[in-house]
From Swiss-Prot:
Family the UniProt entry places it in: Belongs to the neurotoxin 10 (Hwtx-1) family. 51 (Hntx-8) subfamily. Hntx-8 sub-subfamily.
Tissues where this protein is expressed: Expressed by the venom gland.
Upper lineage: Eukaryota, Metazoa, Ecdysozoa, Arthropoda, Chelicerata
Xref: SUPFAM superfamilies: omega toxin-like
Protein name as catalogued: U3-theraphotoxin-Hhn1i
UniProt keyword list: Disulfide bond, Ion channel impairing toxin, Knottin, Secreted, Signal, Toxin
Segments forming a coiled coil: none
InterPro entries in the record: Huwentoxin-1, Huwentoxin_CS1
Role noted for this protein: Ion channel inhibitor.
Domain of life: Eukaryota
One GO CC annotation: extracellular region
Pfam family, one: Toxin_12
GO molecular function: ion channel inhibitor activity; toxin activity
Protein's organism: Cyriopagopus hainanus
Length: 87
């Protein structure tokens, strides 16, 4: 009887240890994609978009005029490509 109790205790302790190890490795794996994405999409000062006098594609055109090749959508007030049905 004692041997069965000891084996049950060891089995339970092993399962708890396995759970703790799996949880720790999973939490590290969750942080890895966040770190990878933040390093890929980190904005460097050299690559920041310069302020323009005109608004580009899908930019708000209430205060700024659209850049050449785009027209201001009357409904959404965004700069969009000119199309025959928008003329």
């Amino acid at each position: 009887m004692v041997n069965m109790e000891a084996s049950m205790f060891l089995t339970f302790a092993g399962l708890v240890l396995l759970f703790v190890v799996c949880y720790a490795s999973e939490s590290e794996e969750k942080e890895f994609p966040k770190e990878m994405l933040s390093s890929i999409f980190a904005v460097d000062n050299d690559f920041k978009q310069e302020e323009r006098d005109c608004a580009g594609y899908m930019r708000e055109c209430k205060e700024k005029l659209c850049c050449s090749g785009y027209v201001c959508s009357s409904g959404w007030k965004w700069c969009v490509l000119p199309a025959p049905w928008r003329r």
